[in-house]
């Protein structure tokens, strides 16, 4: 029976308040309005961004909310005026929209679409939510809210992909893989024969490693306090790995000793201010580039010695790996289907939505 135009009742993982665990609830998902798409979410990743939300009571979020932004699914229905997807299409959800009209979208080097700011309201463009639970309106998150069996997203935050793509794998292209891989390829523009250091070997960091390898880096040094991550990092391209806790000197001094002149390209893939300072200090003093890939706390100010900038070092931000979301994501999926990209090592566990709190615990212990 068709559900077009009807309210859909389904399961969602709701955060009712800061610091609380996810609660699996039945929610009502309203039909899409103009320029909106309702999607059956088939697969979604648990990203470090959600972990930061769960671990902080100080983020400027509205509750209750449905998190999740790393998703893939099938279009269930479309609102008036939608022209780029149709019911039955396989799609990837995009926390970073591409409106195609703003200054960033029209600039060949830009990808930070102005419509991203809409996500901060945690509502749709008309100022309302498409989710309700127990008679209460539930806030959206990150333009996507994929921790729900069905979600409603603006058309500019949806990318149609290959009809035979495995959604349980390509959902990672929705954020983690693209963010890390693109940070190396697009943001840093890693050069052949260069030396790279990746601080943090989670899913995003491993994707950075793959990006550095694809760009032709001669030496890729992985840095993490969890030695269990080293084997996979080396399988994906890291030439060596270091645990700062095992070193007698600060990591930046060790990296200078190992390379004689410092690192060409450093990547902070954790979202830790102290690690960022160490990564920047590890860069070659004449031309080293440090890219901030991890999400840093918005409420904390950077404290980096000004002496580090009495040099040719560069510190760069990166959002979604520099990709223009709707334009480039289908191409990345096509590359995966052509076996040019490897997502499989990034998948450690597959759980049902009602096991989401178990997934959180696995990630906290470094097993996810």
UniProtKB/Swiss-Prot annotation:
User: What keywords are annotated for this sequence in UniProt?
Assistant: Cytoplasm, Metal-binding, NAD, Oxidoreductase, Phosphoprotein, Zinc
Q: Which CDD domains match?
A: alcohol_DH_class_I_II_IV (cd08299)
Any known activators or inhibitors?
A: Inhibited partially by pyrazole (10 mM) in the reaction mixture containing 100 mM ethanol at pH 10.0.
Cofactor note as given: Binds 2 Zn(2+) ions per subunit.
pH profile of the protein: Optimum pH is 10.0.
GO CC list:
cytosol; extracellular exosome
Amino-acid positions noted as binding Zn(2+) 2 in the UniProt annotation, renumbered to this chain: 99, 102, 105, 113
According to UniProt, the reaction catalysed is: a primary alcohol + NAD(+) = an aldehyde + NADH + H(+); a secondary alcohol + NAD(+) = a ketone + NADH + H(+)
MF GO annotations: alcohol dehydrogenase (NAD+) activity; all-trans-retinol dehydrogenase (NAD+) activity; zinc ion binding
**What family does this chain come from, according to its entry?**
Belongs to the zinc-containing alcohol dehydrogenase family. Class-V subfamily.
- Other facts: There are 7 different ADH's isozymes in human: three belongs to class-I: alpha, beta, and gamma, one to class-II: pi, one to class-III: chi, one to class-IV: ADH7 and one to class-V: ADH6. Isoelectric point (pH(I)) is 8.6.
Q: How is this protein named in the record?
A: Alcohol dehydrogenase 6
Instruction: Write the lineage as a comma-separated list.
Output: Eukaryota, Metazoa, Chordata, Craniata, Vertebrata
Q: Which gene encodes it?
A: ADH6
């Amino acid at each position: 029976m068709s559900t077009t135009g009807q309210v859909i009742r389904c399961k969602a993982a709701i955060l009712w308040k800061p610091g609380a665990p996810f609660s699996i609830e039945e929610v009502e998902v309203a039909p899409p309005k103009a320029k909106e798409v309702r999607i059956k979410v088939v697969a979604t990743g648990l990203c470090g961004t959600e972990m930061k939300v769960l671990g902080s009571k100080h983020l400027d979020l509205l509750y209750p909310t449905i998190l999740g932004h790393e998703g893939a699914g099938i279009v269930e229905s479309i609102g008036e005026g939608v022209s780029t997807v149709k019911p039955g299409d396989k799609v990837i959800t995009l926390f970073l929209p591409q409106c195609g009209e703003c200054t960033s979208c029209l600039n060949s080097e830009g990808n930070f679409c102005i419509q991203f700011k809409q996500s901060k309201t945690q509502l749709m463009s008309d100022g309302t939510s498409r989710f309700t639970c127990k008679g209460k309106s539930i806030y959206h998150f990150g333009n996507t809210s994929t921790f729900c069996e069905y979600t409603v997203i603006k058309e500019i935050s949806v990318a149609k992909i290959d009809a035979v793509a495995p959604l349980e794998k390509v959902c990672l292209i929705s954020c983690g893989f693209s963010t890390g891989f693109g940070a190396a390829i697009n943001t840093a523009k890693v050069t052949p024969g260069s030396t790279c250091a990746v601080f943090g070997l989670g899913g995003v960091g491993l994707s950075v490693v793959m990006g550095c390898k694809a760009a032709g880096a001669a030496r890729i040094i992985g840095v993490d306090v969890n030695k269990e991550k080293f084997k996979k990092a080396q399988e994906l391209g890291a030439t060596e790995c270091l645990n700062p806790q095992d070193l007698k000197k600060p990591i930046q001094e060790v990296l200078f000793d190992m390379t004689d002149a410092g690192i060409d390209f450093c990547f902070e893939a954790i979202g830790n201010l102290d690690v960022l300072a160490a990564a920047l200090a590890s860069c070659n003093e004449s031309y080293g580039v440090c890219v901030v890939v991890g999400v840093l706390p918005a409420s904390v100010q950077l404290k980096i010695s000004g002496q580090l900038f009495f040099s040719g070092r560069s510190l760069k931000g990166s959002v979604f790996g520099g990709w223009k979301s709707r334009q480039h994501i289908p191409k990345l999926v096509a590359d995966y289907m052509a076996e040019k990209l490897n997502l499989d090592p990034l998948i450690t566990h597959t759980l049902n939505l009602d096991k989401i709190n178990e997934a959180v615990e696995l990630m906290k212990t470094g097993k996810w």
